[in-house]
From Swiss-Prot:
Biased composition (Basic and acidic residues): 425-444
Protein name per its UniProtKB record: Actin-related protein 5
Lineage, highest ranks first: Eukaryota, Fungi, Dikarya, Ascomycota, Saccharomycotina
Major location (coarse): nucleus
Subunit description: Component of the chromatin-remodeling INO80 complex, at least composed of ARP4, ARP5, ARP8, RVB1, RVB2, TAF14, NHP10, IES1, IES3, IES4, IES6, ACT1, IES2, IES5 and INO80.
Organism of provenance: Saccharomyces cerevisiae (strain ATCC 204508 / S288c) (Baker's yeast)
Length: 755
C-alpha cells in the first residue's frame, strides 16, 4: 500500500445480520377491559397485521402477517407460531409463510389461523362466535373472489354481527380529514403496490385512481437483484430480511436524481454517501506463535530460499553452457560454409536438420539472442561467487589436457567435473565481458541522449513521448489479450484453438522430419521465434509459454518506468497524472469506486471479501416509484400520474387549475409503510412545484409513522356513529343479498367502474 493510501481513514463497516430474535411472546390483552360492543379494526396488510379496538389511539397488536407450523422431533408434537411468535426461534422464523401471494390472499387456512390468534390476543370472549363488529382493509379495486372469501370467514366461521370493508389509503385520508367531506389527493406507498387516488368531498374517485405495480416488497427484491449482479461471487447468501434492513436503513429518495446520479461516484461524494455493509461470518483465527517459533520459521525459509537459489543458479549455468557450445558449433558451421557452393551448403544444412539456409540463419539468430539474454542474467549474480569458484577451480583443471586412456575411472569422473566447472567459468567470464560491453554502450547512449536533449529539447521530448505511448499501447493490448485468453468463450480464445489445431495438423503432415530436441533447452531449435518482432505477437496469441510472456511484460514495464522518469525530470508538461501507474490508480477507476468505494481494496482481507458497498443503489432503488421503467414496469411514475390527475382532470385547463384541483394540491397525503423512505415528501413537493402553475400553494402531509394511518382512519370512522353505520354490512344483509353484495360508501370500492 502506498503512503498516499495509508493515510486514508478506513470506512466503517456495518454488519448486517438478520433482525434479533424476540425474547418474549406476543402479550395478551386483559379480558377484564373487554367490551363486546366495541368494533375491532384490522389492517390486514401483506407485510404487517395491525389490530386493536377502536377505542384505543393506536393498534395494540402489530406483528408480521406470517405463520409457521413447526414440528418438534424431540417432543413429537406440532406447534403453530403466528406473528411475532415466529421470531422467537431462528428455525421457526426461517419456515414462516404468508397467506399472501403478491397482493392477493391465497391461503385462507392460514388466514383463519392468524385471525384466531389475533382475536385470542385481543382478549375477545367468544359468544357463539365473535360478538364485535369488524373493520377490515382491502386493496384498491380488489377482485370479487377476495371479498367473497372474507364474507364467508367472517360471517360463517366467526359469526360476526357486521363488517366494514374499505380501501386502506382512503381510511388513511379519513384519519386526516375526519369530517368526511374534504377534497385531496392520496399517494399510498404500500408493500405490494403504489396508488394515486383523487378524493372529492371525502369520496375516492376510483375511476381516476391509478396503481403502480411496485411496492416495498418489489423494492427489496430489486435491491437483492442489483447486489447479486454487482457481486456475483459474494461468499455468502444474504437473506430477504438482511436486504430489507439495508433498504430501510440506507436507501433514500434523491431530491434530484439525474444530478445526483452523475456525481455519486466521485471521491468527494463517496466519502460521505458510500455505505459499507458486511455479511456476518465466522473468522478463523490462526494460533499465535512465539518469537522463538517465528525466528526458527524465518531461518528455515531463509535456508530454503538459499538452497532453491543455488539450484536455480546451477540449472541456469547448465543451460548457459549448453547454449554456448551449441552457438559456437553452429557459428563454425556458418564460417566453414561461407565460400562453399550453394548445393553443398544446402546438403550440409539439410543433414543437420534445417530446411534451407534461411531457416539456418533464423535459428542461429534466435539462439544468439537467447544466449545474450542468459549471459545478462548470469552476470547479475554476486561477483564473490565468481571469485570463490575461480579460487577453488584454478588448480583443478590439470586433468583436462590428459587423454581418457591415461586416466582411471575416478580420474575420468573428476575430469568431467573439471570440464563443467571450466565451461562455467568461461561462460561467466563471457557474461562479464558482455555486461561490460553493454554498460559501455549504455554510457555512450546516455551521452548521446544528453547532447540531443541539450541541443533539441522539444524534439527529444516528442521522441520520448512517442516511444512511451507505443509501449503503453502495446502493453495494454497484451494485457487485454491475456485476459481474453482466460475466457474460453471469447473470440480470441476460439481463434487460438483453431490456430493450435492448424499447427497440429501441419506437424502431422511434416512428420518427424526434424528431430533436434537435444540442441537447445528453451524450445525446439527450429522454432525461430524472436527473429522478428511480429513473432512475439504470434507467441502471445498461442501462449505456449506464459512465463516468458510475463517476463516480457516486466521488461516492457521497466522501459516504461524509465521513460516516465526521464520525462518527469525534463518535460515540464509531464506530471505524475500522466504516468502509467496513475492510469491504473483505483481513484481513476469508476468500476473500483462503484464496487469498492473510496478506499483501496485488499482482496486478501477476509472482512473486505464479505463486504458490499451501497452507493448508486441507495437512490436507484427508491427512484423506481418515480420512474417505474427502471424496475421493468411499463407504467408512469407517481408524479406523472399526479400531473395527469391535477392538470387534465376535474375541469383543469393548461396553465389554470380548477378549484377541485387546487383543493387537491392543498391537501396531498402520503401514506403507507413504503412512504417511510427518507426524502419522499421533499421530492414530491419539488416535482409538484415543477409541473404546477407558478405560485400554486402546495400542502403535503405525512405522519411520523404512515404505516398506522389506515388503522387510525378505521378507528376514527368507527367513532363517528353516523358515518360508520352507513358502511356496515350486517350478517342479515349478507344472508339476504349473498357474497357478491357490496355496500358502497365514500371509503370503499364500488361494484362497477363507470366511464
Amino acid at each position: 500500500m502506498s503512503s498516499r493510501d495509508a493515510s486514508l481513514t478506513p470506512l466503517k463497516a456495518v454488519v448486517i445480520d438478520d433482525p434479533p430474535l424476540r425474547q418474549t411472546p406476543e402479550p395478551f390483552d386483559e379480558q377484564s377491559a373487554y367490551n363486546p360492543q366495541s368494533p375491532i379494526a384490522i389492517d390486514f396488510g401483506s407485510s404487517k397485521l395491525r389490530a386493536g379496538f377502536v377505542n384505543h389511539a393506536t393498534p395494540t397488536h402489530i406483528f408480521p402477517n406470517a405463520l409457521t407450523k413447526f414440528r418438534d422431533r424431540k417432543l413429537n408434537k406440532n406447534f403453530t407460531f403466528v406473528g411475532n411468535d415466529t421470531l422467537l426461534d431462528q428455525a421457526v422464523r426461517s419456515q414462516s409463510r404468508s397467506p399472501f401471494d403478491g397482493p392477493f390472499v391465497t391461503n385462507w387456512n392460514l388466514t383463519e389461523e392468524i385471525l384466531d390468534y389475533t382475536f385470542h390476543h385481543l382478549g375477545v370472549v367468544p359468544d357463539n362466535g365473535i360478538p364485535n363488529p369488524i373493520l377490515l382493509t382491502e386493496r384498491l379495486a380488489t377482485v370479487q373472489s377476495q371479498r367473497t372469501n372474507w364474507y364467508q370467514i367472517l360471517f360463517e366461521t366467526y359469526n360476526v354481527p357486521g363488517v366494514t370493508f374499505g380501501i386502506d389509503s382512503l381510511f388513511s385520508f379519513y384519519n386526516y380529514n375526519p369530517s368526511g367531506n374534504k377534497t385531496g389527493l392520496v399517494i399510498s406507498c404500500g408493500h405490494e403496490d403504489t396508488n394515486v387516488i383523487p378524493v372529492v368531498d371525502g369520496a375516492g374517485i376510483l375511476t381516476d385512481a391509478k396503481r403502480i405495480n411496485w411496492g416495498g416488497h418489489q423494492a427489496v427484491d430489486y435491491l437483492n437483484d442489483l447486489m447479486a449482479l454487482k457481486y456475483p461471487y459474494f461468499p455468502t447468501k444474504m437473506s430477504y430480511l438482511q436486504y430489507e434492513t439495508m433498504y430501510k436503513d440506507y436507501c433514500y429518495v434523491s431530491r434530484n436524481y439525474d444530478e445526483d446520479i452523475e456525481k455519486i461516484l466521485t471521491l468527494e461524494n463517496l466519502d460521505t454517501n458510500d455505505v459499507v455493509v458486511e455479511a456476518p461470518f465466522t473468522e478463523v483465527l490462526q494460533p499465535q506463535k512465539t518469537e522463538e517459533e517465528l525466528r526458527i520459521q524465518a531461518e528455515k525459509r531463509k535456508e530454503t530460499g538459499k538452497r532453491l537459489q543455488e539450484q536455480a543458479r546451477l540449472k541456469r549455468m547448465e543451460k548457459l553452457v549448453q547454449k554456448q557450445e551449441e552457438f559456437e558449433y553452429f557459428s563454425k558451421v556458418r564460417d566453414q560454409l561461407i565460400d562453399e557452393p550453394k548445393k553443398k551448403v544446402l546438403s550440409v544444412l539439410q543433414n543437420a536438420g534445417f530446411d534451407d539456409e534461411r531457416d539456418f540463419k533464423k535459428y542461429l539468430h534466435s539462439l544468439e539472442q537467447s544466449l545474450k539474454k542468459a549471459q545478462m542474467v548470469e552476470a547479475e549474480d554476486d561477483s564473490h561467487l565468481d571469485e570463490m569458484n575461480e579460487d577453488k577451480t584454478a588448480q583443478k583443471f590439470d586433468l583436462l589436457d590428459i587423454a581418457d586412456e591415461d586416466l582411471n575411472e575416478d580420474q575420468i569422473k573428476e575430469k568431467r567435473k573439471q570440464r563443467f566447472l571450466k565451461a562455467s567459468q568461461d561462460a561467466r567470464q563471457k557474461a562479464k565481458e558482455e555486461k561490460e560491453r553493454v554498460a559501455k554502450e549504455e554510457e555512450e547512449k546516455k551521452l548521446k541522449e544528453q547532447q540531443w536533449r541539450e541541443t533539441d529539447l522539444n524534439g527529444w521530448i516528442k521522441d520520448k513521448r512517442l516511444k512511451l505511448n507505443k509501449l503503453i499501447k502495446r502493453r495494454k493490448e497484451k494485457l487485454k489479450l491475456r485476459d481474453e485468453m482466460k475466457d474460453r468463450k471469447s473470440q480470441v480464445s476460439q481463434n487460438r484453438m483453431k490456430n493450435l489445431a492448424s499447427l497440429a495438423e501441419d506437424n502431422v503432415k511434416q512428420g518427424a522430419k526434424r528431430n533436434r530436441h537435444q540442441a537447445t533447452i528453451d524450445n525446439d531449435p527450429n522454432d525461430t521465434f524472436g527473429a522478428n518482432d511480429e513473432d512475439w505477437l504470434i507467441y502471445t496469441d498461442i501462449t505456449q509459454n506464459p512465463e516468458a510472456f510475463e517476463e516480457a511484460l516486466e521488461y516492457e514495464y521497466k522501459d516504461i518506468v524509465e521513460l516516465e522518469r526521464l520525462l518527469l525530470e525534463h518535460d515540464p508538461n509531464f506530471t505524475e497524472e500522466d504516468t502509467l501507474e496513475a492510469q491504473y490508480d483505483w481513484r481513476n477507476s469508476i468500476l473500483h469506486l462503484f464496487l469498492r468505494g473510496p478506499r483501496p481494496h485488499d482482496s486478501e482481507n477476509i472482512h473486505e471479501q464479505h463486504q458490499m458497498h451501497l452507493n448508486v443503489e441507495r437512490i436507484r432503488v427508491p427512484e423506481v416509484i418515480f420512474q417505474p421503467t427502471m424496475g421493468g414496469q411499463d407504467q408512469a411514475g407517481i408524479c406523472e400520474l399526479s400531473e395527469t390527475i391535477l392538470l387534465k382532470k376535474f375541469g383543469s385547463q393548461p396553465g389554470k387549475l380548477s378549484q377541485t384541483s387546487i383543493d387537491m394540491v392543498n391537501n396531498v397525503l402520503i401514506t403507507g409503510g413504503n412512504a417511510k423512505v427518507p426524502g419522499l415528501k421533499e421530492r414530491i413537493v419539488k416535482e409538484f412545484t415543477g409541473f404546477l402553475p407558478t405560485g400554486t400553494n402546495i400542502t403535503v402531509n405525512m405522519s411520523s409513522d404512515p404505516s398506522l394511518d389506515a388503522w387510525k382512519g378505521m378507528a376514527a370512522l368507527a367513532r363517528n356513529e353516523e358515518q360508520y353505520r352507513k358502511t356496515v354490512i350486517s350478517k342479515k344483509e349478507y344472508e339476504e343479498y349473498g357474497p357478491e353484495y357490496i355496500k358502497e360508501h365514500k371509503l370503499g370500492n364500488t361494484k362497477y367502474f363507470e366511464d
